[in-house]
Regions:
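Hydrophobic alpha-helical transmembrane segments
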Residues: 1-203
Length: 203
């Protein structure tokens, strides 16, 4: 899975599991806000249900594919592809290189570097000088390396350990997708503003 991620990364033409998770979160959020209104307790309950549905559903989908791969050899390549989809090492490396390339040109193309950096950070990058751009790039690269590479690998290892004890237990894909679901929830709902301060509590 790591080799596949390094080789092809996340092709833009291919539907990514995180895109599906994001679409589900968006729809469930609309329903939760329509039903809960501005009542904190109702929004917290709705957020808890969103978290349970998304994390539980992602883990269940991963577990189902794992079980299928145990009994159907043709499903093994699908399992490997699914595991690779939980990793973002190549995508992160390319995103970092997209910022470093204009910075290393002579003279540095700061405007291009700011534009590329703006795609991967959640802060205002206008007016940043080269040292500040590099600092912001280093910060976001380290954060995304945890969320996109090291944490999924950690949960894959835990899942592999569980699988070795009993193949019926959740394995590497189930735990990796559950983590990606919780990470996506945090990035979309984990804000202390408006209704999200209650809706995003569980996520």
């Amino acid at each position: 899975a790591c080799g596949l991620d390094r080789l092809i990364g996340d092709p833009r033409w291919c539907l990514h599991p995180v895109q599906v998770m994001g679409a589900v979160i968006t729809q469930l959020r609309l329903w939760a806000e329509a039903i809960g209104g501005d009542r904190p307790w109702a929004l917290r309950l709705g957020g808890g249900l969103i978290t349970a549905v998304l994390v539980g559903g992602s883990a269940a989908a991963g577990w189902a594919l794992e079980q299928l791969s145990l009994h159907s050899p043709w499903a093994v390549p699908l399992l490997v592809i699914a595991l690779a989809s939980a990793l973002a090492g190549r995508s992160l490396r390319l995103a970092v290189e997209d910022v470093l390339t204009p910075l290393s040109s002579a003279p540095p193309d700061l405007e291009q570097a700011r534009r590329k950096l703006g795609w991967i950070v959640g802060r205002d990058v206008e007016g940043l000088a080269a040292p500040e751009l590099l600092r912001a790039l280093a910060e976001t690269a380290s954060e995304n390396a945890v969320d996109g590479l090291f944490a999924p690998l950690f949960w894959m290892l835990i899942g592999a350990g569980l699988w070795s004890l009993n193949p019926a237990l959740p394995g590497p894909l189930a735990l990796a997708w559950a983590f990606k679901a919780s990470s996506t929830l945090d990035s979309m709902l984990g804000y202390r503003r408006g209704r999200l301060q209650w809706l995003g509590t569980a996520g």
